[in-house]
Regions:
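Glycine-rich Rossmann-fold phosphate-binding loop(s) that bind the pyrophosphate
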Residues: 135-136
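NAD(P)-binding Rossmann-fold cofactor-contacting core
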Residues: 149-178
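Rossmann-like adenosine-cofactor binding region
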Residues: 182-226
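Aromatic pocket-lining residues of Rossmann-like dinucleotide-binding sites
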Residues: 146
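N-terminal ligand-binding/catalytic initiation module
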Residues: 1-108, 114-116, 126
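N-terminal Rossmann-fold NAD(P) dinucleotide-binding loop
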Residues: 139-140
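Short helix-loop-beta connector
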Residues: 122-129, 219-221
Length: 226
């Protein structure tokens, strides 16, 4: 049995091109009919804490797995992520446990890459301006993969990213594209500024569209929200 902790998973991902990660998501979605996916089990706890348990069998790959992920508020003196998870990977025809994997980084990766994949499928093909709300780890993965998939196809169009100023988080996004002269930035002070004039909006925070409840952009058909 292999044990892959957070750093081991991150090291594998670091060697994998973002465009390849998007291809994996695309392949998984196309194979969806081959998966046995029971409903996710949600176990609520006090103060909004919870566990989610997600089993799956993929017979064609001889794989069975379960992911258990939980969100728990940080207690005083603790140094950990509020969201943590683990994945158990089995041979489906024998029940032999083959791997215990950290699920935290994979969950962040899956969420960001899936959003980038959806945006490539559904946003207007002539997009130029992309608004970003919530500039954490998921957004970092998402926008990096989104731009990488364009470049992998030879699309060198100019893309403007609209970022909200928030505790310096915008700098991390800007640093991602330091070597790409065709990615430009507009720094904004409000969500309305981020959304106004954007062809596509990624919202990677707990509020989503509710972050701008009183603006005409919330239900705009001229924009694509993810």
């Amino acid at each position: 049995m292999e044990v892959l902790d957070f750093e081991a998973v991150r090291a594998i991902v670091a060697e994998t091109p973002d465009s390849e990660l998007i291809r994996w998501v695309d392949e998984a979605l196309r194979e969806k009919s081959g998966y046995t996916l029971p409903p996710k089990i949600h176990i609520a706890q006090q103060d909004g804490d919870y566990y989610n348990v997600m089993p799956c069998i993929y017979e064609r790959g001889n794989i069975a797995m379960v992911k258990m992920i939980g969100r728990h508020s940080i207690k005083r003196g603790e140094d950990r992520s509020s969201m943590m998870g683990d994945i158990l990977l089995y041979e489906s025809d024998t029940g032999i446990l083959r791997a215990l994997m950290d699920g935290e980084y994979i969950t962040t990766l899956r969420t960001g890459i899936s959003a980038a994949h959806s945006a490539r499928l559904f946003t207007r093909p002539d997009f130029e301006t992309v608004g970003l709300i919530g500039l954490g780890n998921i957004m970092t993965v998402c926008i990096r993969a989104f731009i990488a998939s364009l470049r992998a196809e030879g699309d060198r169009r100019d893309v403007t990213l609209k970022l909200i100023r928030y505790h310096g988080h915008q700098q991390r996004i800007m640093d991602l594209f330091r070597e790409d002269p065709n990615v430009h930035f507009v720094l904004c002070d409000t969500y309305e500024e981020v959304i106004g004039g954007s062809d596509l909006v990624f919202a990677a925070n707990i509020y989503g569209r509710a972050a701008v409840p009183d603006t005409p952009y919330r239900h705009s058909r001229e924009k694509y929200f993810i």
